[in-house]
Amino acid sequence: MVKKKKKVFAFDIESNALYDDITKVWCIYIFDVETGERWGYRPHQIEDGIRKLTEADVLVGHNIIDFDLPALKKMYPSLINYHFNVFDTLCLSRYLKPDRIGDSPEYPKGDPRRGPRGHGLKQWGEFLGELKGDYGEQEEAWDAFTEDMFTYCEQDVNLTVKVYLFLCELTGFDPYDPPSLYWKM
């Protein structure tokens, strides 16, 4: 019997604030891990982006359990009223090496088990040779949607996919049929 591949979408959102302070989702960017198809949604298309997310069997992201999905649930409760199967790269990074310092002598330089200096997407980008970008370093950057913000969101998804594929290879997970957590709010 041939096992059906799961539809795995990596995604990210950008918003005007974090956690309880969020009042606006500016954009969503989605990447189909198998086909490489991409979809980007700007402020007037957020509901379309959420509907696209519902087509996935598994959602992949960096900190989606703690931020992205709760933010979407807060801002669009009528559209986020069911479960998702999720693979959070931040959670797995922390699980695999909770004391990650990056320069640990237990593994030689170049050994993939050595990992980045921390668990953040920026640290992973430095480790994998794909920089996250520097958008948003000024506080007012998140006050209004810009195309630079949209490009930053896209780059976060590109990097998240690289982290995801790296972690799948490291753990032996099939990136097209990954283990996932059941998430419901």
Swiss-Prot record:
InterPro entries: 3'-5'_exonuclease_dom (IPR002562), RNaseH-like_sf (IPR012337), RNaseH_sf (IPR036397). The keyword Hydrolase applies. It is an enzyme of class 3 (hydrolase). Keywords: DNA replication, Exonuclease, Hydrolase, Nuclease, Viral DNA replication. This is 3'-5' exonuclease gp74. It comes from Escherichia phage Phieco32. One of its GO terms (biological process) is viral DNA genome replication. GO terms for molecular function: 3'-5' exonuclease activity; nucleic acid binding. Signal peptide: none annotated. Probable 3'-5' exonuclease involved in viral DNA replication. The lineage of its organism: Viruses, Duplodnaviria, Heunggongvirae, Uroviricota, Caudoviricetes. Its EC number is 3.1.11.-.
